[in-house]
Every structure is written in C-alpha cells, then in structure tokens.
C-alpha cells in the first residue's frame, strides 16, 4: 500500500484540493483503522477547472468492500466537484502468487488425491495455500476435501471456501454432482477463469489440479496464468509413463518448469501377511525421471488408508502417521525445487 507521504503527490495543493481531501478524510477506512486519507489510500488527487481525478488504493481490502467504498468516495467528491467530470480509478498491489500445476497423462493415477494432500501438507507447514479443482469434467476435490459447500460471491468474484486450512474452489461446488457437464472447450476455459480469478486474498501458492491429458483447460492455464512449476503424477507402469511423458512435453513446450515426478501406487503391502507386491510395477517413474533429466520427488505406496481418507473427506495429510509424513516430505521436496 502507498504510504501517506507518497499518496499525496504534489507539494503545492490548492485550497480546492485541500477541501477535497478534507471531504475524503471523513470516510472511515474499511480496515477500521483511521480514515482513507491518513491510511494512504487517496493517490494523486487533482482538481482542475474541468475535472476532479484521483486513484483509490484498495490493497489489502476484501473485494466485497471495494464497491461500497467507491460509492462513498464518489458521493464525497460530488459535493466538491460541482459540474466537473469525476475521474476515479481503483488500484491495488497484487499479491505475488505462485501457481503449481499438478498434472498427469491419464486418469486413474491418483493425481487429485496427490494434489489435495500436497495442498494440505503445505498448509500444515505454515504456507497460505489455495486449491483449484480444474478437472472441470470430473471434479473430485469436494469429496476428497470434504467440502461440498457452494461458495459465495462478491461482485463478479467467487469467494473460496476453506477446508483443512486450505482455501479451495471446484466446479463441483457449483453444479449438481450427479449431472454431466457437456461443455465445449470455451465454456470449460471460462469456468477455469472464474476459479483462478476468484478472491484468493493473501494466498501464496495455488495448487491447480488439472484434468488428465493435454486439452483446452491445460492450454488455458499455461497460456494465461503461467504456472511457476508443474508436478506430474504417474504410476510405475509403462502405459502411465507414456502418457505422463506427453504431459511433460506440453509443459516444456509452454516453458513451464517441471518441478518433478511423483510415483503413486508404488507397492502394496498385504494387510494380513505384510508381503509387498507391485501390481503396477516398481521403480518405473524414478527411472523415467532420470532418463528425462527431471527431479524424482518421491513415491507413495498403494495403501487402503489413503483411499479411505479421501473418500471420507479427510485427506491423509490432515492426519498424523507414516503416510501423512510421506506427503509432508513430498511438499518439502517441491518447495525445494520451486525455490
């Protein structure tokens, strides 16, 4: 936010400008701390023979307060402006927010489960995290995160809901969960825009759970919002790795850094005898990462508790135990690559 000293540009203020500032100083700052002039929200006030102009800095204010504050300012200015044209613009310092795309070449590899648990693990580590369910045609984050509540809106912006310390939005919260979405590419891309451009406040990192494959939604995200990095999830089997390679190729073509590969469903321990089997193979993702020159972030075993936790709406990372520690370590590895 601009400081009070910098906010009042120009050393010589006319009496009319002083009157304008006095009128604006009667408006209480929405933060509850002083008025909008002393808080430095009034920038470059100027009164000429034909116009009254100023900028209003709304940095740090909830979007729901912007329109009411603008109305108050316009009303105050009208008393000074007379027949002059009023020129008022709102401005804000946008919080730098890093997008981490979580993708896969094909469905069924546990990408959404991994995305949700990474988001929760990062939130538990003290990060301010947002989670966007960009899997428009098959949104599963409301179930995994246990949050089907429909989000409110302020003006044209959605207001994310919070679950397990993570702000989240999903198209699954906005439509009937039992109805198919027969949307063409432009409609899906527009839906993604509504989710990404929501009022995320001071969110530092946004985890975006992408649809499987390399379609319109992926292209929209990569072209318009340029993720800081991408994480690709795959099972060890060759079929998944072939498709994962296509996702990696897309990220590279769009100049999005690959933070690393995660091997999911890596080994199954029999709950009765403890013997470990590898229904999807073993070590394939780590080998592929080495071959492609990509960092291997780690592996997650095929464990019934991870599946049941997601079905129950409480991601494993929100609990304590060995599996939660795995996601905590994965989150640390991703942050190390990102930084």
Regions found by a protein language model. Give the residues of each.
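Glycine-rich phosphate-binding loops of nucleotide-dependent enzymes
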Residues: 169, 210, 329
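C-terminal lobe/tail of nucleotide-utilizing enzymes
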Residues: 15-17, 39, 58-64, 68-71, ...
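N-proximal, solvent-exposed amphipathic alpha-helical segments enriched in charged/polar residues
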Residues: 8-9, 13-43
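Extreme N-terminal, non-catalytic leader segments
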Residues: 38-104
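Inter-motif core of Ras-like GTPase G domains
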Residues: 218-239
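Walker A/P-loop phosphate-binding motif and the immediately C-terminal alpha-helix
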Residues: 98-135, 248, 252
């Amino acid at each position: 936010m601009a400081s009070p000293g910098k906010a009042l540009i120009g050393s010589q203020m006319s009496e009319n400008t002083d009157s304008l500032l006095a009128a604006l100083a009667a408006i209480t700052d929405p933060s509850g701390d002083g008025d909008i002039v002393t808080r430095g929200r009034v920038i470059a006030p100027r009164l000429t023979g034909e116009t009254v102009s100023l900028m209003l800095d709304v940095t740090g204010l909830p979007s729901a307060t912007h329109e009411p504050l603008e109305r108050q300012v316009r009303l105050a200015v009208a008393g000074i402006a007379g027949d002059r044209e009023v020129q008022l613009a709102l401005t804000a310092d946008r919080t730098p927010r890093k997008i981490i795309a979580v993708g896969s070449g094909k469905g069924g590899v546990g990408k959404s489960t991994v995305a949700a648990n990474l988001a929760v693990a990062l939130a538990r580590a003290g990060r301010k995290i947002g989670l966007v369910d960009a899997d428009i045609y098959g949104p599963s984050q409301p179930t995994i995160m246990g949050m089907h509540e429909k989000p409110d809106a302020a003006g044209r912006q959605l207001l994310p809901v919070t679950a397990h310390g993570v702000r989240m939005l999903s198209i699954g919260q906005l439509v009937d969960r039992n109805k198919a979405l027969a949307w063409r590419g432009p409609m899906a891309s527009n839906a993604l825009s509504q989710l990404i451009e929501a009022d995320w406040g001071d969110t530092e990192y946004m985890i975006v759970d992408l649809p499987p494959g390399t379609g319109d939604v992926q292209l929209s995200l990569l072209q318009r919002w340029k993720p800081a990095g991408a994480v690709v999830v795959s099972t060890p089997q060759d079929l998944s790795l072939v498709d994962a390679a296509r996702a990696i190729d897309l990220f590279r073509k769009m100049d999005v850094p690959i933070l690393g590969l995660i091997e999911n469903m890596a080994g199954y321990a029999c709950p009765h005898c403890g013997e470990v089997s590898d229904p999807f193979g073993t070590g394939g993702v780590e080998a592929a990462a080495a071959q492609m020159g990509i960092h291997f972030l780690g592996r997650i075993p095929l464990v019934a508790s991870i599946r049941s936790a997601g079905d129950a709406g409480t991601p494993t990372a929100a609990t304590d135990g060995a599996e939660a520690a795995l996601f905590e370590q994965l989150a640390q590895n991703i942050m190390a690559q990102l930084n």
